[in-house]
Amino acid sequence: MPQLITYGNELIRINPANNRIEYSTNRGISWMSRYSGSSCGTFRDLLPYNGKIIAVTDKGVYYSSNKGISWMSRNTSSQAKTFIAIQDAGRELLAQTNDGHLYYSTNEGISWMRRR
């Protein structure tokens, strides 16, 4: 599923055709590649959060502090690999899994607990 976020004065998106992180500075008229690596896995969702971009991939949760140029692992546990969507819920992050479970994090995605 393609994901598009606003980050500063840019639009940033996942291009599902080639798994690239792309950006636009002209409201989406043209797009430039920002990240085309494969070490993070397949990107599923993006979230601007506390001055960073948090990404959910098939390898876990990653973050970027430089607009998506590079990515650092945040959590690569087996449960994080099933996340398909991430949401800012104020004092916590929420992540939905591919089997319908909901997880929450109170430490910017470092650890996750299943919501009962």
Q: What residues fall within each predicted segment?
A:
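Tryptophan-centered short beta-strand motifs
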Residues: 31-32, 71-72, 112-113
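Short coil turn/linker residues within repeat-based beta-strand modules
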Residues: 18, 28-29, 68-69, 109
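Loop/turn residues immediately N-terminal
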Residues: 17-21, 59-62, 99-102
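Blade-level signature of beta-propeller repeat domains, shared across WD40, Kelch, NHL, RCC1
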Residues: 100-116
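Entry beta-strands of beta-propeller and related beta-repeat scaffolds
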Residues: 4-13, 51-55, 90-95
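Surface loop/turn motifs at the tips and blade-to-blade linkers of beta-strand repeat domains
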Residues: 35-38, 75-78
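Repeated scaffold domains used in trafficking and secretory/extracellular systems
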Residues: 1-8, 40-49, 80-89
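Conserved Ser/Thr-centered positions that define the repeating blades of beta-propeller domains
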Residues: 24-25, 64-65, 105-106
